[in-house]
Design a protein with these regions (language model features):
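Bacterial Sec-dependent N-terminal signal peptides
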Residues: 1-25
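Short N-terminal segments immediately surrounding and downstream of signal-peptide cleavage
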Residues: 22-36
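Short, surface-exposed loop/turn motifs at beta-strand boundaries within globular domains
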Residues: 37-42, 52-54, 183
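Hydrophobic residues positioned within well-ordered beta-strands of beta-sheet architectures
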Residues: 45, 59, 186-188
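Short edge beta-strand/loop segments characteristic of extracellular beta-sandwich folds
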Residues: 46-50
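Structured domain cores in non-transmembrane regions
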Residues: 53-127
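Extracytoplasmic electrostatic interaction patches
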Residues: 104-193
Length: 193
């Protein structure tokens, strides 16, 4: 009798371990979509701009080639100031319809939203023996305290470069490393008055 009871108990345990190995679906949240959107060219960076709410602001773009600022840079995205009415600013990049431009987007909460294009420069990709457009973006860590009438960099958009020493095309490292090595980049930011 004890053998039958023991065998029955073991079979029940084996059956229960099979039940424990089922796969269940999880609720899909926005965090599931973010890596997929990034892979398709959507990038977004959100900033708390509550410290300058109510101030007059301009959006600025600075372009650099081989470490030197381009002659007509910096430039305003709009030819006027506007009053910042919101606490949040989102800068982002959207998939472009062609390789030679990047489509940028910004949205200042309760204030203004727009998009514009940045012209890109080709990079010779030695490993592929061809010219390509290859860029990446990342946010700056905003500095404190914020100063009036001073450019505040928020996001950089930098091209990859060929690293001859390691025989690889790359765009990695700290922001200061990338800015030293990238042959072409933009810095997007704001000024307040």
């Amino acid at each position: 009798m004890n053998k039958k009871l023991l065998i029955t108990a073991l079979l029940a345990l084996v059956a229960m371990t099979d039940w424990a190995q089922e796969i269940k679906t999880n609720e899909t949240t926005i965090n599931v979509y973010i890596p997929m959107l990034n892979q398709k060219g959507y990038q977004a960076y959100s900033f708390d701009v509550s410290a300058i709410k109510g101030k007059n602001v301009t959006f600025n773009v600075r372009e650099f080639v081989d470490g030197k600022e381009v002659k007509d840079s910096p430039r305003l995205l709009f030819p006027y100031y506007f009053q910042a009415n919101g606490d949040k600013l989102v800068y982002g990049f959207l998939p472009s319809e062609n390789d030679s431009t990047a489509l940028c987007y910004f949205n200042w909460e309760n204030t203004l939203r727009s998009s514009w294009s940045l012209k890109l420069k080709q990079l010779y990709w030695e490993s592929e023996n061809k010219y390509v457009y290859s860029y990446r973006s990342d946010p700056f860590e905003p500095t404190s305290p914020l100063e009036k009438d001073t450019f505040i960099p928020l996001v950089y958009y930098a091209s990859f470069w060929y690293d001859a020493e390691n025989k690889v095309t790359r765009c990695c490292g700290t922001i200061s490393d990338i800015i030293k090595r990238s042959p072409h980049y933009y810095i997007l930011g704001i000024k307040f008055y």
